[in-house]
Regions:
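A structural signal for multi-pass alpha-helical bundles of membrane permease subunits
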Residues: 1-179
């Protein structure tokens, strides 16, 4: 194990716990200066940067549960490090990777602050578009449109979770207990 791995993870989680408004406000001035505000790639980069500490923290707990003996025995059987990782470690890690990927996807999919601040109206994602159905103080909203949009936005997530249900359950239980 690395000497300062715990403190690096904690520093990353502290940044993850900060309000997104605080993190995104630092990006706005360079994005305007470089003329990359309002497009999807910059928003994707910011969402990856914000969700990366959570992803590393989850994967770290899964990696701690893999016995070191598996890696060593694969190398005794003639595998090099890459083959041992590919054929032994990845199949064991697959439920954890799927679970972490789905959690990260859900965090980015449901993000309102980052997408509403960094994207222009023509590149708007689903969550700010749904919020626009609710109206403002000056005009009445279309609440039934918002409800229909929420159901439409939730349906793909439901099917995605149902498709990966077995990996999610085994991934959640695998990273829960160290032993």
């Amino acid at each position: 194990t690395y000497r300062y791995a715990f403190w690096i993870l904690m520093a990353g989680l502290i940044f993850r716990a900060m309000p997104h408004m605080t993190l995104v406000s630092g990006y706005l001035q360079p994005f305007f200066a470089w003329n990359v505000w309002g497009i999807l790639p910059t928003t994707i980069i910011v969402l990856v940067a914000i969700n990366q500490p959570f992803t590393l923290w989850m994967l770290h707990s899964f990696f701690l549960n893999i016995p070191k003996d598996l890696d060593e025995s694969a190398m005794c059987d003639g595998c090099n490090r890459f083959q041992a990782f590919r054929y032994v470690i990845i199949p064991i890690m697959w439920p954890g990777v799927i679970t972490t990927g789905l959690f990260s996807f859900l965090l980015a999919y449901n993000d309102f602050t980052v997408t509403s601040m960094l994207l222009s109206d023509e590149n708007e994602t689903m969550i700010p578009a749904i919020a626009s159905f609710l109206g403002t103080v000056q005009e009445e909203g279309k609440v039934m449109y918002a409800v229909a949009a929420v159901v439409s936005a939730t349906a793909p997530l439901f099917f995605l979770v149902m498709f990966f249900q077995r990996q999610i359950v085994s991934g959640l239980t695998a990273g829960a207990v160290k032993g």
